[in-house]
């Protein structure tokens, strides 16, 4: 389960492998955890994820 501390660290780009594992294991069994997140946290999580995917192309 994702704790609030993990979410804060997650938004800070904790670990790319861990981030990918969390996204790949997203399913109906843990949606209640995600529903407890604010929309801002969810937005930042995906912003961080896509920034990581695009960093080679954007050279940031």
Curated annotation (Swiss-Prot):
Q: Name one Pfam family in it.
A: E7R
Briefly describe its induction.
Answer: Expressed in the intermediate phase of the viral replicative cycle.
GO CC terms in record: host cell cytoplasm
Keyword terms, alphabetized: Host cytoplasm, Lipoprotein, Myristate
What happens to this protein after translation, modification-wise? Myristoylated.
State its location(s): Host cytoplasm
Q: What is its main location?
A: host cell
**Family label:** Belongs to the orthopoxvirus OPG069 family.
Q: What is this protein called?
A: Truncated protein OPG069
């Amino acid at each position: 389960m994702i704790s609030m501390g993990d979410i804060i660290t997650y938004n800070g780009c904790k670990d790319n492998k861990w981030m990918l594992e969390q996204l790949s294991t997203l399913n109906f069994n843990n949606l209640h955890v995600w529903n407890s997140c604010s929309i801002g946290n969810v937005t930042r999580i995906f912003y961080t994820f896509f920034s990581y995917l695009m960093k080679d192309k954007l050279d940031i």
